[in-house]
Amino acid sequence: MTKTPTLKEIFYNLQNQMIQKLSTDRKIIFHSPTKGGATELNWIDWLKKYLPNRYQVDQAFIVDSNGRFSEQMDLVIYDQQYSPFVFNQDGAIFIPAESVYAVFEIKQDLDKANFEYASDKIKSVRLLNRTSAPIVLASGRIDNPKKPFQILGGILTLTTTWQDVFGEPFQKAISETDKISRIDMGCCLEKGSFLIKYESDTYSFETSSDDESLIYFFLKLLSKLQELGTVPALDINAYGRALDSI
């Protein structure tokens, strides 16, 4: 009789497949931008496949009602239910800030430079203005607009150059980021994943083992997305004011 695989074995195999894909790209693709693009596409495709359908996943720029843009984000998790303005111009995707749940920077290695780079890009999103408008449900109109939550920020890598993955250099990088630049979570596929919890001016973090990095990251991401609930409805009139005729 064929043995039924356990949930852990299924995720372990998915993790090995992902590591194999990214490692092969790293070895074979010598052009750095092309290599980076392939890595980003692998992460986007994986999350598109396994996240619930309510969550959209793409590489994108984030825009607000004041006409300001973030840097291009490697991976954006967003919702179109109450924020319908998502533009795709020849592959360049523009998403309103109100519809964003989370943004991730994707790199080959987890190290100080990439951690700081990811923090700066996350900050460029969190600095954008987000509106919130009343919504109408089958049960009636909700007149108290939902307060925008802090967008999740993270980093995804294949491996790390830190000998002690979550040791002193990692902790120093966390402590040196300001509140708006904070990284909440990340996955280093070959070495483990992490979730950081902030309280006032202090923080704590938890990590996974190296053989559970993907399942740990995925389940923690799902949990954080559930905690956020639904994105606020954007104020369509605020965006309309960008046009002279409205």
Language model feature labels by segment:
Residues M1-Q72, I77-I246:
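Intrinsically disordered, low-complexity Ser/Thr/Pro/Gly-rich regulatory segments
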